Amino acid sequence: AYDFCVAKGIALTPNYSDIWIQEQGPEVVFPVVNSNPNKTSAWEYTTRPASVSRDKSYSNPTWEFVKSFPMLDGKQYDDPSSKYYVGDEQALLKSFWQNRDPRFNNVCLYNGREYPVAGKSANYRQYNALGISSPDDQYGVNPNAHTNAVNNDIFSGFYIYKAADLTLTQDKVMTYDIDYILMRFAEVMFIYAEAANETGHSETAVEM
């Protein structure tokens, strides 16, 4: 499969963030082809914050997912040998966006992050804090006011940024038709490397 893909000119996408939005990109092996209006995807309107969508988001990154993302040096946040070591989970809550693997910002939208979505100002930021954000987006607890956001049982306070089509205005989110990638070249390489390692060809696995 690897040799077949290489022979067909399939290769890794240079920019990670382009993998999900570049249709028929160099890394695509098996896609689900979408084309508005005949076939659209629910991805955009089920992952965006409600204030810029047509409904509340139903697919959200969890805190466990955010914690699991490596730091800039590839190590976990609680690894004492990491240059970016964070002592505990409570400390990470206050700095989870700092010194992370660059892919983190290509995957997660979080409170206070710049969000250049169509229909908003060029420097628009997405908030979910009580008293600051749109009520539809609010998440968390205000202990001083003894108030909880009404969305705490609906979503996690994080949103998916991956594969977002930020050129779509709020009224167009249901026309999202970017192809969905079922398999990309990186997965073929991982499978090849795993098979090589399991059959005693560790050097091939490392090179892959």
What residue ranges belong to the model's regions?
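An aromatic- and glycine-enriched ligand-binding surface/loop that stacks and positions planar moieties
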Residues: 1-140
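Extended, hydrophobic/aromatic-rich amphipathic alpha-helical segments that build helical scaffolds
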Residues: 1-7, 30, 96-98, 104-109, ...
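Active-site beta-strand/loop architecture of penicillin-binding DD-peptidases
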Residues: 136-184
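Acidic, serine/threonine- and proline-rich low-complexity regulatory regions
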Residues: 12-16, 169-177, 197
